[in-house]
Regions:
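Conserved nucleotide-sugar donor-binding catalytic segment
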Residues: 1-78, 85
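Membrane-proximal basic amphipathic "stem/tether" segments
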Residues: 80, 87-111
């Protein structure tokens, strides 16, 4: 997702947030069934401009297996929910729709 305007998604397996940050930006929005973490990180980085730190390159901090919660949802459901998140957080609608269409086309031609 870096090509979508320099925004990296992250997984909660290696992400720690102080309580004061949750008080400032809010908790995870549970209305997003498969991308509430994406919304949280979007608000954290793009809306509130919080900065963080990262680990060394190629440092293992958690281990995920295939078939987790998010794999129950289709590619289209993920992209649609991320589109709603971007719109709900005030990103330019033309940019959001363009990204949505490009991601769908990219996935279609990949099949």
């Amino acid at each position: 997702m870096f090509w979508s305007f320099n925004f990296y998604p992250a997984h909660s397996g290696g992400f720690f947030v102080k309580r004061i940050i949750h008080k400032k930006i809010g908790l995870y929005k549970l209305k997003y069934k498969c991308s509430s973490d994406y919304d949280f990180f979007w608000r954290l980085i793009n809306k509130y401009k919080f900065k963080g730190t990262s680990t060394k390159k190629n440092e293992l901090i958690s281990n995920f297996k295939l078939g987790g919660f998010s794999s129950k949802y289709s590619f289209f459901q993920h992209v649609l929910e991320e589109t709603h998140i971007r719109m709900d957080n005030g990103q330019n609608k033309i940019i959001v729709i363009t990204i949505f269409l490009l991601r769908c086309l990219k996935n279609f031609y990949k099949l």
